[in-house]
C-alpha cells in the first residue's frame, strides 16, 4: 500500500467514524472513536500506548503491496453490510433483551489493529463470542472491521460456513490472520477452542486458553498488541456435565473432528445428550457480562520468537488477567442463568 493510499484510507476511516447510527443493522455508532488504552508494561519492561498509530500494521508497512491471500476469500472482506442490516433487529433484541448484554472497555482499544483474545462458552453456539462480534459492529460499523475465527468444521459446513464468511469470520490460520492485519482490521481469537467452550459447568467462570500459545507469536510477528477479553454468563446458556475426554479418545474424534472432547450436556429442549453439533440446543436466556481489558504490547524483536520462556510468561500473564476480570464479573451474578 502506498503512502498516499494509506493517508487517503485513514482520512476516509476517520470521517466514517464520526458518523452516527444506533442499531447493529445500521452499522455505525454515535459514540466517539475509542481512545487508546492505558499504557501497559510489556514483557521487555517498556511502556507503550495505542497513540494515534495508523490502522495498517507495522509489519504490513514493510511488505510489498497486496497480501499473499485474495482478500475476497475466507471472510477477509469483513462483515457484509447488507447482511448485518438485514439481521440487525434480531441481534439487537437478543443482545439487549434476551441476554441483557453488558459490555465495557471500548475506550481501552488501541487505535492500531489488535488481536483480541478471550474465552467463549456455551458449547458450539458460544453466545458470548457472538455478542462481542455483533456489539463491535454496533459500535464501529464499517469503519473498523473485526474478524471472528471459527473451527474448520464450522467454516467448511455448506450453509453455516458461508454465513460465517459473510460475517467476516475467518479460519484461524497464520496467513488469514496476517492478511486481516495487513488490511488494517482487528481479529479475535479464542485459543481454548473446544476445551474452552465445553468446559464443565462447575468451571464456567474459569479462563481456559488450553495451553495453546501460538497467538502470542502471531501478534509478535504482526507487530500488534494483544487485547484480553473477559466474559461470564455465556456458560449458563448450556450445562456441560462432562467434557467426555475418554469418550472422545474412544471415538477417535481427534482425527475425525480435531476435537479432544465428546461433551455430555443438559440443555433445552433435548435434555441430557452427547453434544457434537451446533443445533442440539436453544441457549438459555443467561445474562452476559463482558469486559475489554487494557492492551498488552509485546516485544517484537525477532529473536524473541524463539524465546520460549518469554512466550510462556506472556501467555500466563494474559490468562491471569482474564481470570481476574472474570472473577470480578462473576461476583455481580446473583443467580445462575437469570441474573
Residue ranges of model-derived segments:
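Structural motif
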Residues: 115-117, 188-190, 291
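Hydrophobic/aromatic ligand-binding patch that stacks against planar heteroaromatic rings
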Residues: 163, 179, 217-221
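Membrane-anchoring hydrophobic helices of lipid-metabolizing enzymes
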Residues: 25, 35-176, 244, 320, ...
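A cross-family acyltransferase "interaction/gating" segment
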Residues: 193, 203-303
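N-terminal acidic, proline/glycine-rich, low-complexity intrinsically disordered segments
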Residues: 1-39
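C-terminal terminal-subdomain/extension
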Residues: 156, 279-339
Amino acid at each position: 500500500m502506498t503512502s498516499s493510499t494509506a493517508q487517503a484510507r485513514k482520512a476516509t476511516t476517520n470521517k466514517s467514524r464520526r458518523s452516527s447510527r444506533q442499531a447493529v443493522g445500521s452499522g455505525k455508532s454515535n459514540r466517539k472513536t475509542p481512545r487508546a488504552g492505558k499504557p501497559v508494561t510489556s514483557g521487555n519492561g517498556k511502556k507503550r500506548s495505542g497513540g494515534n498509530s495508523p490502522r495498517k500494521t507495522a509489519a504490513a508497512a514493510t511488505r510489498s503491496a497486496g497480501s499473499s491471500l485474495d482478500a475476497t476469500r475466507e471472510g477477509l472482506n469483513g462483515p457484509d453490510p447488507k447482511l448485518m442490516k438485514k439481521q440487525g433487529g434480531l441481534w439487537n433484541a437478543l443482545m439487549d433483551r434476551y441476554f441483557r448484554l453488558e459490555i465495557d472497555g471500548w475506550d481501552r482499544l488501541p487505535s492500531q489493529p489488535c488481536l483480541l483474545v478471550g474465552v467463549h462458552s456455551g458449547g458450539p453456539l458460544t453466545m458470548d463470542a457472538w455478542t462481542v462480534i455483533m456489539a463491535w459492529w454496533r459500535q464501529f460499523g464499517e469503519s473498523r472491521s473485526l474478524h471472528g475465527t471459527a473451527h474448520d468444521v464450522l467454516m467448511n459446513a455448506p450453509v453455516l460456513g458461508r454465513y460465517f464468511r459473510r460475517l467476516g469470520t475467518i479460519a484461524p490460520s497464520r496467513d488469514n490472520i496476517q492478511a486481516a492485519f495487513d488490511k488494517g482490521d482487528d481479529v479475535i481469537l479464542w485459543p481454548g477452542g473446544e476445551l474452552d467452550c465445553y468446559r464443565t459447568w462447575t468451571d464456567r467462570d474459569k479462563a481456559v486458553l488450553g495451553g495453546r500459545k501460538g497467538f502470542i507469536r502471531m501478534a509478535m510477528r504482526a507487530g500488534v498488541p494483544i487485547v484480553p477479553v473477559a466474559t461470564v454468563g455465556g456458560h449458563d446458556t448450556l450445562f456441560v456435565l462432562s467434557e467426555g475426554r475418554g469418550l472422545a479418545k474412544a471415538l477417535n474424534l481427534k482425527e475425525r473432528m480435531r476435537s479432544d472432547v465428546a461433551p455430555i450436556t443438559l440443555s433445552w429442549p433435548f435434555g441430557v445428550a452427547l453434544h457434537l453439533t451446533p443445533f442440539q440446543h436453544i441457549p438459555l436466556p443467561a445474562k452476559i457480562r463482558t469486559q475489554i481489558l487494557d492492551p498488552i504490547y509485546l516485544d517484537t524483536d525477532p529473536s524473541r520468537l524463539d524465546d520460549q520462556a518469554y512466550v510462556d510468561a506472556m501467555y500466563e500473564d494474559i490468562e491471569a488477567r482474564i481470570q481476574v476480570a472474570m472473577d470480578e464479573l462473576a461476583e455481580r451474578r446473583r443467580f445462575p442463568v437469570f441474573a
